[in-house]
Amino acid sequence: MLLTVTSAHLFPSQVVIHFKPGRNTCSECHESLNVQKTRPGKRAATLAIGDFIAHETVYYCPRCGRVFHSDELRALIPENSNFGYDIIVFIGKSLFLRCRNYQEIRLELQLKNVRISESEIAFLAKKFVLYLGLLHRLVRRKTKKYMHMNGGYILHLDGTCDGGSPHLISVLDGITEIVLDNRKLPSENAEDLIPFLQSIKKSYGVPLAVVSDMGKGIALAVKEVFKNVSAFICHYHFLKAVGKNLFGDENDILRERLRKHNVRVILKRTKSRLEKAMADTTGLVHAMIAGIECEKLPAECPLSAVPTVAVYTLISWVLDSGSEGNGFGFPFDQSYLVFYQRLQEASLRLRQLFRIQLQGNWKENKVYSTISHDLHSVINDVGLRKAALRMEEKVAVFNRLRKAMRITLPETGRGLNDNGDPSVTIKTIEKEVGKFRAWLSKSRGYAEHKEYRKLAKQIDTYQEKLFADPIVVETAAGRILVQPQRTNNILEQFFRKLMRTYRKKNGFNSMERVLKTMLPDTPLTMNLKNQEYMQILLAGKKTLEGRFAEIDSKVVRRGLEQSRSGTSTMYPPLKKIIRIPGLPKSIVSLLEQTAS
């Protein structure tokens, strides 16, 4: 029975707890302490107690004037705060580890007798990140020592941005998978990255190697700060850049032409109309499914309704083209090409269906001719067809390279979490890519397509940076070989998870506003899963909240103030008028007219 008891049932609705300093004499002059004041009626909450009223008695020394607060209360709740350290930790872990949104966290805390609003949860989530960042910097030397016990560290550098947001840049050690530092920068240009990388070098020393994407700014910054350090390219980013260069133009044509024909709107409108037509006849779709599975329509299925269901099923199949992807995104998934291919296939089947008379009456097939007529312009678009054919050819070449590099393969089922096949050596991959390069130069399209020649040049240019030999390092246990990871997927996965969490919370896809207000140290929450790092961070304490209690709350408040001051705000109605063409002239004209 005790297992079902929560803090909500242990105390009455509003328990009062008294706190006072743990000493009666001054720690400096040993004078007896006097009562300075009693703070009544402070609303407080912890996970263990739930909501309660804290009465704190404050002492002072009459000789030196020192003020003494309750250490017990300060160990539970930060100064000038209503919620305990354990609630801050609960919110942080719920948001970043369990991917709960604010509403779900609020309901969970409500069950623990903690009344809290979603805005307070958002505020405490920021405090969690600030506390984590402060602790991370306090144990920086111990982290460096731990990494060097493993022979050193391999610096993985990656970033994310959206629209006009700043670039959130993160670095981690590829060996221990510890996030080392984060910074918001206006761009990924070398001049912005160099100071950040210099601070990494100062804090953690020179890395064994650097792994990054193919950005020129990153390459220049790494070369400037980490001279004579091997720099490697993430295989995922290499393939992504290759795919965009290879058939990005064709993909753009497909997207623009399909939008011009308004084909999705046509299909959705027709589907909606057919749904209404089928509403009075129950079980039609199930009958069609049963017929396809058994290769025979059920006897109870009305033949007059079959054409309608057939068209409805074909349209649904075309609109479901996105399911054919493997979660990689473009260029690994070609959603517009797949949509067009399904559209062509459906058009062919509609013509075949039109020739079939289930009841010997052509009128019953009018639904086929109607949708075929609606799709006539897009199906007969010559430019669209040529672009699709070129793209199909180039995608086949791209998939051949993916297979050679043993990464982002559809059959793995790992989507963007694919770090490459660990059973395949880097030398084997290098050999297979060499075979692909030789095949490409002899292929029919090599002379015809400049994109093929550019692909070959990219392989030649980045050959050494793609295929890293194991690095020999000295450790306390002796000499070992360290193989740099082939991808930056650890950071990529975190950024995707983080964006998914915020999209779930906010309900919109654009992350520009989120990235502008997000604290730079947010990626440090990745380290919460790293047991070795957590031992360093806890420094002998049993819990994270115990470590948070050791941080001066004034430092945290300053961090919150700085984060707010760095966020620009704008009066909402102003957003509408600042995009008016000729706004400055309009302001002058308005005031001139008013003055006259």
Tell me the role of every PLM-derived stretch.
Residues 33-96, 150:
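Basic, short loop/linker segments at the boundary and entry of helix-turn-helix/winged-helix-like folds
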Residues 61, 91, 105, 155-160, ...:
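Short, conserved catalytic/metal-binding motifs centered on acidic residues
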Residues 2-14, 38-49:
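Short Cys/His-rich Zn2+-coordinating modules
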Residues 97-109:
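Short, charged amphipathic recognition helices of the HTH superfamily
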Residues 23, 212, 219, 264-596:
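Acidic/histidine-rich catalytic cores and adjacent linkers
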Residues 12-23, 49-55:
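Short, flexible, mixed-charge glycine/proline-rich loop motifs
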Residues 26-29, 61:
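Short cysteine-rich clusters marking metal-coordination/redox-active sites
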Residues 35-39, 111-211, 216-229, 245-252, ...:
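RNase H-like nuclease fold core
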